[in-house]
Amino acid sequence: MQAHNLVYFSSVSENTHRFVQKLGVPAMRIPLHSRIEVSDPYVLVLPTYGGGRTAPDLQAGGYVPKQVIAFLNNEYNRALICGVVAAGNTNFGAEFCYAGDVVARKCGVPYLYRFELMGTEDDVTAVRAGLANLWKEH
């Protein structure tokens, strides 16, 4: 694998994929049905699933896509994560971008940014700046 700054998962909605494309940085996509292994430090970008329940239950689980869980269950992949960026929908209320909270906490890495759906140009600018700062430190 070449050096990649981002690893991301995007469902068939392609919202996260479109956001990552706007960033214009090297990225590797976690596939829907197969496994990948990374060899370089990366920031994970992922959507949040399961939001908007009748009563928010932040302990219920189901926020992190199964493909991301499988990816992070690989100890090599987990060891190289440097930060998390999450997508979500503000309609989810307290669960907005909650997958980022889950992954950052479980992996002990910073939660760098959260954005709605495909993100705005301001989101793209902020994430680019955050990535540049992070990679200076690594």
Curated annotation (Swiss-Prot):
Cleavable signal peptide: none
What GO biological process terms are annotated to this protein in UniProt? protein modification process
InterPro entries, alphabetized: Flavoprotein-like_sf, RNR_Ib_NrdI_bac, RNR_NrdI
- Name any one Pfam family assigned in the record: Flavodoxin_NdrI
The record's comment on protein family reads: Belongs to the NrdI family.
Q: PANTHER family this protein is in?
A: PROTEIN NRDI
Q: Which NCBIfam families match?
A: nrdI
HAMAP family listed in its UniProt record: NrdI (MF_00128)
Its annotated function is as follows: Probably involved in ribonucleotide reductase function.
Q: What is this protein called?
A: Protein NrdI
**What is the organism of origin for this protein?**
Mycobacterium leprae (strain TN)
- Source gene? nrdI
